[in-house]
């Protein structure tokens, strides 16, 4: 699905950068660009979202936004447990910082 989305977007207009909203979208974008011989970052800059071990295998190294999934999971579980203890409470907003990991997939075009 991500591959088709990128194909549709890039067939309509030339963009200088793409922010892929999740790991699957990042992969679809990479596959499409490789197939069409679009060079990252020379033709299009790419920022991915979610860091898993495979991102280190790509050349150039991807710039990514890393979410601490373990902290997110912990916050979700704690929120559910709090809700079970006090179902009528409004709940709370929890924020967890993400980290930008600079790679080699972005440049000024």
Predicted features and spans:
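Structural motif
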Residues: 1-12
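Flexible loop/turn connectors
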Residues: 11-109
